[in-house]
Amino acid sequence: MKRQKRDRLERAQSQGYKAGLNGRSHDECPYQQTEVRSYWLGGWRDARNDKLSGLCK
């Protein structure tokens, strides 16, 4: 069970990162559950920071 939960959270973080790189708004987060939403937003923030610092185009 823990592995499935971790994979789901990692997937949410990965999708958030991709959304951030593509310039999507954080308001477009598809998740309603607080824990999963926080992982998605964390990925989104990481991508925005990477993009602003010039690590990604």
From Swiss-Prot:
Its main location: cytoplasm. Gene3D superfamilies: ribosome modulation factor like domain. Residues 1-28 are annotated as: Disordered. One of its GO terms (biological process) is regulation of translation. It comes from the Bacteria. InterPro entries: Ribosome_modulation_factor, RMF_sf. Pfam families: RMF. Keywords: Cytoplasm, Translation regulation. Transmembrane segments: none annotated. One of its GO terms (cellular component) is cytoplasm. It is found in: Cytoplasm. Belongs to the ribosome modulation factor family. HAMAP family: RMF. During stationary phase, converts 70S ribosomes to an inactive dimeric form (100S ribosomes). This is Ribosome modulation factor. The gene is rmf.
